[in-house]
From Swiss-Prot:
<feature type="compositionally biased region" description="Pro residues">
    <location>
        <begin position="112"/>
        <end position="124"/>
    </location>
</feature>
<dbReference type="InterPro" id="IPR027417">
    <property type="entry name" value="P-loop_NTPase"/>
</dbReference>
<keyword id="KW-0396">Initiation factor</keyword>
<feature type="region of interest" description="G3">
    <location>
        <begin position="524"/>
        <end position="527"/>
    </location>
</feature>
<feature type="region of interest" description="G1">
    <location>
        <begin position="474"/>
        <end position="481"/>
    </location>
</feature>
<feature type="region of interest" description="Disordered">
    <location>
        <begin position="50"/>
        <end position="370"/>
    </location>
</feature>
<feature type="compositionally biased region" description="Pro residues">
    <location>
        <begin position="240"/>
        <end position="267"/>
    </location>
</feature>
<dbReference type="InterPro" id="IPR000795">
    <property type="entry name" value="T_Tr_GTP-bd_dom"/>
</dbReference>
<dbReference type="GO" id="GO:0003924">
    <property type="term" value="F:GTPase activity"/>
</dbReference>
<dbReference type="InterPro" id="IPR009000">
    <property type="entry name" value="Transl_B-barrel_sf"/>
</dbReference>
<feature type="compositionally biased region" description="Low complexity">
    <location>
        <begin position="88"/>
        <end position="102"/>
    </location>
</feature>
<feature type="binding site">
    <location>
        <begin position="578"/>
        <end position="581"/>
    </location>
    <ligand>
        <name>GTP</name>
    </ligand>
</feature>
<dbReference type="InterPro" id="IPR023115">
    <property type="entry name" value="TIF_IF2_dom3"/>
</dbReference>
<dbReference type="InterPro" id="IPR005225">
    <property type="entry name" value="Small_GTP-bd"/>
</dbReference>
<feature type="binding site">
    <location>
        <begin position="524"/>
        <end position="528"/>
    </location>
    <ligand>
        <name>GTP</name>
    </ligand>
</feature>
<comment type="similarity">
    <text>Belongs to the TRAFAC class translation factor GTPase superfamily. Classic translation factor GTPase family. IF-2 subfamily.</text>
</comment>
<feature type="compositionally biased region" description="Pro residues">
    <location>
        <begin position="77"/>
        <end position="87"/>
    </location>
</feature>
Length: 969
């Protein structure tokens, strides 16, 4: 603890209580726990200076006219260091060398020679320059009896008279020592006043030489080896040198508390701390560099030696460069790292101390220091990377990567990370990670462009009645499309492959309610189980749901799913019991079954309207439409503002060969016009053309109107929100951001998590089936991909969709499939141009499907065919060894009796001895019955056999078995 001091010791030294000293330390930004804590030497020095400045007089006494010399005359180099005793005035008669050392005293007027050093930075005046030039020519002078006494200093020629003693300077930053080589001819620069730096001096004498070192303004010789009074030469001329003092002759360090105090001089200049004796004008802190440079030297501004334990480590006596007398240059001993001195520590700023204090409390994961939070909520987008997380918490991404590696996850800084990993990492650092939902993220994106979605602009007077949007839902083959055909008086069902709806259709029909004509918008959704997402989108975009249930079939799984979608979207349901004209129809049974799902008929006291219809015969269709309109008028407020920018939803989208990307859009509010700039999901464009369900052009689409929009630059996703913006530039920026977010989320979802524990298993060879999906519209491709990814056939085979798109199979798809060994699945599309020829040449398999479940079944069979076969053991029979015949050619021959089953030649066998397995994998190499070779011997017959294992004994049991391939489920 060299250089350190305890708080209670400092308090006793300064004459204050420990409590007051602790309060002072707290004001200075030092973190000290108690009075027994230690503080560093720089902190103790600041405390002494602080209390010294408080006890010093406010204003120094005015000096007389003759007070021309600076305070702080240098003592003789040979004088011993004063001890901690009461100082005597230095202006008295000549004392012994121990008493000649000057001490800081209160400034008072006096003659040219003033006592008491006041170490201040050297500030040579401008008239000093001529003398500095002539100084190297002056010869070294020996001390004479008539010379100035030690501790005194003559006024420099041409220097202005000092008006008073300079107050003690504040400690400042220490410049690196220049010229620490005693043999260097390069002088040390002056601190903070480089313009007044003296010129180059002569070569330094060696450590044992006592000759003077000529130089401009260098008035302090090197400390001598023998103490003795040596007069200091006038500043500006050379001073006599002498041998270096021995460490034993150095006096103990004086007690700063017992010394007279002085008023500190304000300003940024650096200098020595109070209480240290000796030093030239501008002398530095005790044992440290003075005002000029750190290290001894007699130049103006030279200090009393090298810093204590600083750059000159290892000087005997605990600090390099401490002179034996005032004004002497620090010796070269210890200047080059010789051990013996404690290393000097620089002062730390409050920010550094605060950072160190925070790092002490920072959590460590596997030895990695991480920032520590206070439970803050960090919002991250789905699929964010560690770089995004590190930017939020102001951390190093490399540290997060290493921390995740220690937690068993191998990711890179720019790789998308799934939600669970982000939450786990955040909890380790005391952060609450919230993965922003896509809806919230999209809302924040639109808010950044001053856009909102889902709200009508204006007040109540701007709202107008709009037609209800009705979605027809139900199980497959229950008659949904037939019902819409009957309503529209068209045959849409025959256009669908297999009679199964595989798209969402949107139509607007005119119906009559009493004497009033009313418009109703119908949305037809698929009923197959693969189209769950389509049904969910239909439920979200609708006002009323018609649940079609076949009277002869009852409630089916997709019926229940449709009910759940409608109830989740808080949509009222009207039940249409279809096929009442068929044999075995039981509408009452349907009503009873639906009560289990919260749909209670009105005749049973509920609030759900049931209508028995026959879509094929056209029975009660008007009653169903009337029920829909009554429900809409009674339960819903169907109004929207048509005088605003249009907002809607893309129900379906596909790529048309002649028209390009086409989206079926349902307008929810506002009016969509030709020429509007639009954005839907990650697709944007300008409305070039709008077509209704009859193929007629539409110039403006009002709320609840379904239209086909032509003009997108790419195919939007099914279910994406459509928004009209002011400029194409804004639409493009929104689409680009959504596209980037979509890619990140897809990468995070598709990334296979590989932890350190299952690294060996991950490195094993696994079979992978690569697919490229092409469909006629976005919804079909989405449904097909979700259905295929849901196939579970085991961990040995993995399905991977490397590309997906809308439109025909192109040559680009074939080239990608050839490079990645993939199969192309075309759903309701065919190959374009020379794609088929290229596929045949490259050996790429293209499969075409028109019904979705056929594609699912074939892909599942292909995956199962890629699985490694599973074998099961089937026991054939058991035989007991009754005798052993030894042969020099074939070895031991076992004479056996077949106890059960049969024994076959070349079958695998297991040798048991006292019910203990002796040989596990042996083979029956030969089998004979009497003298004939046979392939099989049945139960109850004797035989002779040889095994691939010769250590057999009488009484052993041979168990024959075979491995048969087990079919995959």
């Amino acid at each position: 603890m060299a250089g350190k001091a305890r708080v209670h010791e400092l308090a006793k030294e300064l004459g204050v209580t420990s409590k007051e000293l602790l309060a002072t330390l707290k004001e200075q930004g030092e973190f000290v726990k108690s009075a027994s804590s230690t503080v560093e030497a720089p902190v103790a020095r600041r405390l002494r200076e602080s209390f010294a400045s408080k006890s010093a007089p406010a204003n120094g006494a005015k000096p007389g006219p003759a007070a021309s010399a600076r305070p702080g005359a240098k003592p003789t180099p040979g004088g011993p260091r004063p001890g901690p005793r009461t100082p005597a005035p230095a202006a008295s008669a000549p004392q012994a060398p121990a008493e000649q050392t000057a001490r800081p005293t209160d400034a008072r007027p006096g003659p040219a020679v003033k006592p008491g050093p006041a170490p201040t930075p050297a500030r040579p005046a401008a008239p000093e320059a001529p003398a500095a030039k002539a100084a190297p020519e002056a010869p070294a002078q020996r001390p004479t009896p008539g010379g100035p006494r030690p501790g005194q200093q003559q006024q420099r020629p041409g220097a202005p008279a000092q008006g008073g003693p300079r107050p003690g300077p504040k400690p400042g930053p220490k410049t690196p020592r220049v010229g620490n080589n005693p043999y260097s001819s390069q002088p040390a620069p002056e601190r903070e006043r480089p313009a007044a730096r003296p010129g180059p001096g002569g070569p330094r004498p060696g450590p044992a030489q006592g000759g003077p070192r000529p130089g401009p303004g260098q008035g302090a010789p090197r400390p001598g080896a023998t103490p003795g009074p040596r007069p200091a030469a006038a500043q500006g001329g050379p001073r006599p040198g002498g041998p270096r003092p021995s460490p034993g002759s150095m006096p103990p360090r004086p007690n700063p508390g017992a010394m007279p105090q002085r008023t500190p001089r304000p300003g940024p200049s650096a200098g020595g701390r109070p209480g240290r004796p000796g030093g030239a004008p501008g002398a530095g802190r005790p044992g440290g560099g003075g005002g000029g440079y750190r290290g001894g030297g007699g130049a103006p501004g030279a200090g009393a030696g090298a810093p204590a334990g600083g750059g000159f480590r290892g000087r005997p006596g605990g600090g390099g460069g401490r002179p034996g007398g005032p004004g002497g240059r620090g010796g070269a001993a210890g200047a080059f790292g010789r051990p013996g001195g404690a290393p000097r520590r620089g002062r730390k700023s409050k920010r550094q101390k605060r950072q160190e204090y925070d790092s002490m409390q920072a959590p460590s994961v596997g030895g990695v220091r991480l920032p520590r939070g206070n439970g803050e909520i960090i919002r991250l987008a789905r699929g964010a990377s560690l770089s995004d997380f590190a930017e939020k918490i102001d951390a190093n991404p490399a540290a997060l990567v290493q921390a995740l590696f220690n937690l068993g996850e191998m990711v890179t800084a720019t790789q998308s990370v799934n939600d669970e990993t982000l939450e786990l990492l955040g909890s380790e650092m005391n952060y609450v990670v919230q993965v922003v939902s896509p809806e919230d993220e999209d809302r924040e994106l639109l808010e950044s462009f001053d856009l909102t979605y889902g709200e009508d602009e204006g007040d109540e007077d701007d709202l107008q009645v709009r037609p209800p949007v009705v979605t027809v839902m139900g199980h497959v083959d229950h008659g949904k499309t037939r019902l819409l055909d009957t309503i529209r008086k068209a045959n849409v069902r025959e256009g669908e492959a297999g009679g199964i709806t595989q798209h969402i259709g949107a139509y607007q029909v005119m119906t009559h309610l009493g004497d009033e004509d009313r418009l109703i918008t119908f949305i037809d959704t698929p009923g197959h189980e693969a189209f769950t997402a389509m049904r969910a989108r239909g439920a979200k975009a609708t006002d009323i749901a018609i649940l079609v249930v076949a009277a002869d079939d009852g409630v089916m799984p997709q019926t229940v799913e449709a009910i759940n979608h409608a109830q989740a979207a808080d949509v009222p349901i009207v039940v249409a019991v279809n096929k009442i004209d068929k044999e075995g129809a039981n509408p009452e049974k349907i009503r009873q079954q639906l009560t289990e799902y919260g749909l209670v008929a009105e005749e049973y006291g509920g609030d759900t309207m049931f209508v028995d219809i026959s879509a094929k015969q056209g029975t009660n269709i008007d009653a169903l439409l009337e029920a829909v309109l009554l429900t809409a008028d009674a339960a819903l407020d169907l109004r929207a503002n048509p005088n605003m920018d249009a907002q809607g939803v893309a129900i379906e989208a596909h790529l048309d060969r002649g028209r390009g990307p086409v989206a079926t859009v349902l307008i929810q509010r506002g009016t969509l016009r030709v020429g509007d700039s639009i954005v839907a999901g990650d697709a944007y464009g300008r409305v070039r053309r709008m077509v209704d369900e009859h193929g007629e052009d539409v110039e403006a689409a009002l709320p609840s109107r379904p239209v086909q929009v032509v003009g997108f630059t790419s195919v939007p996703g099914a279910g994406d929100n459509l928004l009209v913006v002011d400029e194409d530039r804004i639409a493009r920026q929104i689409a680009d951001r959504r596209n980037a977010r979509k890619r990140n989320a897809l990468a995070a979802r598709s990334r296979k998590r590989i932890s350190l524990e299952d690294l060996d298993a991950a490195l094993k060879e696994t079979s992978e089936l690569n697919l490229i999906l092409k469909g006629d519209n976005a919804g079909t491709v989405e449904a097909l991909e979700e259905a295929l990814m849901g196939i579970e056939v085991g961990d040995e085979v993995r399905l991977r969709v490397i590309d997906r798109g809308v439109g025909g199979v192109t040559e680009t798809n074939v080239n990608l499939a050839s490079a990645s060994n993939a199969i192309i699945i075309g759903f309701n599309v065919r190959a374009e141009g020379k794609a088929t020829e290229l596929a045949n040449r490259e050996g790429v398999d293209i499969r075409y499907y028109s019904v979705i479940y056929q594609a699912i079944d074939e892909i599942e069979k292909a995956l199962k065919g890629m699985l490694k076969p599973i074998y099961e053991e089937v026991e054939l029979g058991r035989a007991e060894i009754r005798a052993i015949f030894r042969s020099s050619k074939v070895g031991n021959i076992a004479g056996c009796m077949v106890l059960s089953g049969s024994v076959k030649r070349n079958a695998k066998a297991r040798l048991l001895r006292d019910n203990v397995v002796v040989a596990e994998t042996t083979t029956i190499s030969s089998l004979r019955r009497e003298k004939d070779d046979v392939t099989e011997v049945r139960e109850g017959f004797e035989c002779g056999m040889t095994l691939t294992y010769n250590d057999i004994k009488e009484g052993d049991i041979i168990e024959a078995y075979e491995l048969r391939e087990k079919p995959r489920d």
